[in-house]
Amino acid sequence: PVQAGQEPGNVERSVRRQLETLHEAGKSSEQNVEFIWRHLGHDDRSIRYAARVALEFQEPALWQKRVLSESYPELLITAAVAMARPGDAVMQKNIVDRLLKIQFSGLSEFQKLEWLRALSLVFIRMEAPTVLQQRAVAQILEPEFPSNREMLDRELAGMLVYVNSTKVIDKTLKLMTETPDAGGEAEIPEVLARNAVYGGSIANMLANMPNLNQTPYAYVLRNMKYGWTLEQRRLY
């Protein structure tokens, strides 16, 4: 029999609960920051989340400079989210510089999504990107798009539009034309055949439906105000 202290996940739950005790004001200390920092890059997402929230309750003076010297990607990305939430514009350039030094191509798909989220939060909460920052982000992400990963491609398209990439329109339109429609078509005729009254009308409606997998890209491109050609507009 498994002892109570040996249950799977028991250690992780204990760590998470310790971190959650720091989710309130008035508990700032160097000792707490050290404990939190050890878990910001944890493999368990719930522990990373608990550590990040705990860090946000610590006095910024105890940890913000430490973020700028951090080299471990997962830890840096998580800490950057915590840093972005208060919205201190003074630190925007420093944290953007640190995020852009991470080798994006070497990250896992999940880490890339977290990186994009962190950078988005920095731009939204702290300060919008400068022209130079826009160009730097585009230079990193353009070779990565498309990635043939649906969720990642949607986020990449959104960021590239946000930074006014000169290549995102062509790449996204091409991706839209090549993206297959959502699945489920194989079962539809059989289902419609069961009802002679409504089947025909529904079949006509489905035949004229837009490609649902194209919709997120069309939605993102609506924000692209510059760089369109007449042919691109027509295709869009």
Locate each region found by the language model.
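Extracellular/periplasmic ectodomains of large secreted or surface enzymes and adhesion receptors
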Residues: P1-Y236
